[in-house]
């Protein structure tokens, strides 16, 4: 019974995501990403539902149903070891789950530092793509009917490393040449880390790091230890954080659809609870005193 129900749920998500695949991608740097101008316009590679050869970082907007949208926004960074993006299972399926919570999702295609011949770095280029995505969403908040003070990041595995690099580290100084979007804050209002990798865990968490929801499997030798370490650092710094470690669970259980364990299957419900408890799912909610960024950039 449970297997059949999960199969139907996965099939429905697959069909929905096939339609969602037609959604346009919004390029974050129309004239080419800094340092990647020579590869601007180069075609991506898609094998099954995995994407690689990304040189023009972009976000695909998956808007929540207008009848239930609450104004929250989440930028999703799929995993894939910085070699490819697990676009369906850790991108579009996650977007659909957030949409059911009334959240508008922005699925990020970022530059892949370990894609053969890419020449990119994780801490430099890929993290810059995530920061630009946060700024871009804030700049276009009015267009997509989201609250610029309720913009979160969500990262899976390698994407979790990017989320941590952006949320839990100081942003580097801006280059001499910037545009209006670059002048907005790149610090997300909250962070959701799904079996995040070890790169990006700070030596000491900052007291002004955004609230965190962290989830991993207890048998995940890659990503359970950094999940625990980051949680302990955030708590020590006085940052609100919640950690879920699921028993007998390994890596890459995605949004629960790859597991038969009920606790794994229902972990997105715990995320919904956390978002609600933090006030992120209601207009004007979230942390008090967070300044609103500048108006929309046209």
Range-by-range predicted roles:
Residues 26, 32-60, 65-74, 79-146, ...:
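Serine-hydrolase catalytic machinery in alpha/beta-hydrolase-like enzymes
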Residues 214-216:
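Short beta-strand/loop motif that positions the catalytic acidic residue
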Residues 237-298:
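C-terminal catalytic histidine-bearing segment of alpha/beta-hydrolase fold enzymes
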Residues 1-11:
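Bacterial N-terminal signal peptides that target proteins for export
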Residues 221-227:
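Conserved alpha/beta-hydrolase "acid-adjacent" motif
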Residues 128-208, 289-295:
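Primarily recognizes the serine-hydrolase "nucleophile elbow" in alpha/beta-hydrolase
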Residues 17-19:
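N-terminal signal peptide c-region/cleavage motif recognized by signal peptidases
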């Amino acid at each position: 019974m449970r297997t059949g129900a999960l199969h139907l749920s996965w099939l429905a998500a697959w069909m929905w995501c096939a339609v969602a695949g037609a959604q346009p991608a919004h390029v974050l740097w129309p004239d080419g990403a800094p340092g990647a101008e020579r590869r601007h316009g180069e075609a991506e590679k898609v094998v099954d539902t995995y994407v690689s050869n990304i040189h023009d970082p972009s976000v695909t907007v998956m808007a929540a149903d207008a009848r239930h949208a609450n104004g929250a926004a989440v930028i999703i960074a799929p995993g894939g070891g910085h070699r490819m993006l697990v676009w369906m299972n850790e991108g579009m399926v996650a977007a659909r789950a957030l949409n059911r919570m009334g959240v508008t999702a922005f699925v990020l295609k970022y530059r892949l530092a370990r894609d053969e011949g890419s020449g990119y770095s994780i801490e430099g280029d890929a993290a810059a793509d995530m920061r630009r995505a946060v700024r871009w969403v804030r700049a276009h908040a009015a267009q997509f009917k989201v609250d610029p003070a309720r913009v979160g990041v969500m990262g899976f595995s390698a994407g979790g490393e990017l989320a941590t690099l952006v949320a839990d580290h100081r942003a580097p100084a801006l280059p001499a040449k910037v545009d209006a979007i670059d002048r907005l804050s790149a610090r997300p209002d909250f962070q959701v880390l799904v079996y995040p990798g070890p790169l990006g865990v700070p030596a000491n968490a900052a007291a002004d790091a955004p609230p965190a929801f962290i989830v991993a499997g207890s048998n995940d030798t890659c990503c359970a230890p950094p999940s625990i370490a980051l949680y302990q650092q955030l708590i020590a710094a006085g940052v609100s954080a919640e950690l879920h470690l699921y028993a007998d669970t390994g890596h890459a259980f995605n949004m629960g659809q790859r597991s038969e364990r009920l606790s794994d299957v229902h972990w997105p419900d715990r995320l919904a609870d956390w978002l609600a408890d933090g006030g992120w799912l209601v207009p004007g909610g979230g942390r008090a005193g967070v300044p609103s960024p500048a108006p929309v950039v046209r």
